[in-house]
Each structure stands twice: as structure tokens, then as C-alpha cells.
């Protein structure tokens, strides 16, 4: 509404100081944000003038609104106020009244652009290009070291290995021999292929004992039987059992 812009234009160009918040390491105003604002105003300011010349009320509303919105986003109070006044008069079908504030808007924009340009130049001068506090590359980091279990340190930023700047060498050596325990032996250890013969003893059964005994006892039994038969022939009273030739011979084992 027009009543919102009846007062004088604010003398303060921004509603806050343009600065960087170092405590949190984050920028309140990034260069990208400032460049985006400048590009937006540089685009819409000439288009607003063209709309005035073409008596394009709708176009004037559009471009003045865009300038006001981007100025409000970064707290550019003076430009926001003048562009908002132009938008309000355009919406009220007062194109000529709105056009009368264009020179003031252009003046405020030029002053703001100068402030932003000086701000960036001073930043580059004091802190170096790229926005880092030490003037160096933000992506460049100090070499870091890791400690191994044996107390030795490892440089993780050694670029000699070509592996992304992290050549980690673990020096684990034997205290007595000084040999690196991580190195594999170049001569492979042969596998043990010669096996010692193993003798397995199994218990013998009764039949095994019979099979392995010498026939001496059997021979003695045979001789004893012959003697008994001869005694029977001589008239002795002892009798020998008659066995069939087909019946198996029984052998008593004790």
C-alpha cells in the first residue's frame, strides 16, 4: 500500500552491518549471495525503465517487485523502500507517479553497488582471494600424522605415493632382529610332504591266536593219541573216542 511508503527514504543502506561471523566460521554474507543480488538488480532495473517508457504497468509492477524482494532478502533497506514505493504506485495505476521515483531508485542502487564492491575489495586485500582467513586455499590442509601401535608416526599427506596424498607405511619390526614383520618372505616355505610311517597294532582274537600259533602242540597231541592207540593195541583198558572223518576236530584252548 502507498501509505507504507509515505515517509522519507531510510538513510541507512542496510538494516545490519555487512560482515562475516568468524566465531562460527560461517559467513553472514557470502560472495555468491552478494553477486546474486547484484545480478538480479542489474537485470530488473533496466527492464523497469523499459516498462515505464512503454507505459507497461504490469511489467513495472513485476520488475519493481523483484528488486524489492531481493533487496529485502539481504537487508538492503534503502533500495527495498524505494522499489516498494514504485510497486505500490504502479498497483494503484499511478504509473507517472511511480516513474518519478525511478531516478532515486537508480541512485540508491548505484550507492549500494559501490558499498558491496568496496566490501569485497577490502576483504580480498585483508584476507586474500577465496575468502580464507589465512589468505590460502581453503582446500589445502596441514599434514596430519597417525600413530601406529608401536609408537611410530605416519604422514597421511605424503603425495609421493600418488594415492590421494595418503601413503601410510606401518613400520613394525622385530626388536631382536630388526626385521620388518610386515614383509612377506620372498622364498616360499615348502610344504611338509614326507610323512613318517605309523604302525597300528590291533588286538588279536582267539582265532587269530590259533592261526598264528605253531603246530607244535597239535603235533604233541597227535603223538599222544598214537601212543594211546598203541597202548590200546597192547591190551590197555583205556578207550579212545571214535570220531567220524567228516566231523570237525575240536581243539581246546586254555
UniProtKB/Swiss-Prot annotation:
This protein's UniProt keywords: Cytoplasm, Phosphoprotein
Superkingdom of the source species: Eukaryota
Bias type Basic and acidic residues, positions: 166-186
Gene Ontology terms: biological process: phosphorelay signal transduction system; positive regulation of chemotaxis to cAMP by DIF-2; sorocarp development; sorocarp morphogenesis; sporulation resulting in formation of a cellular spore
Subcellular location(s) per record: Cytoplasm
Major location category of this protein: cytoplasm
Compositionally skewed regions (Acidic residues) per UniProt: 131-143
Residue stretches making up the HPt domain: 26-123
Biased composition (Polar residues): 239-254
UniProt modified residues of type Phosphohistidine: 65
Disulfide bonds: none
Ranges of Low complexity composition bias in the record: 146-160, 220-238
InterPro entries reported for this sequence: AHP1-5/YPD1, HPT_dom_sf, Sig_transdc_His_kin_Hpt_dom
Function per UniProt: Phosphorelay protein that supplies phosphate to regA or accepts phosphate from regA; depending on the relative concentration of the phosphodonor proteins. In vitro, acts as a substrate for cheA (bacterial kinase). Plays a role in the development. ypd1 (yeast) can complement rdeA defect.
Name of the molecule in the record: Phosphorelay intermediate protein rdeA
Annotated organism of origin: Dictyostelium discoideum (Social amoeba)
Gene name per UniProt: rdeA
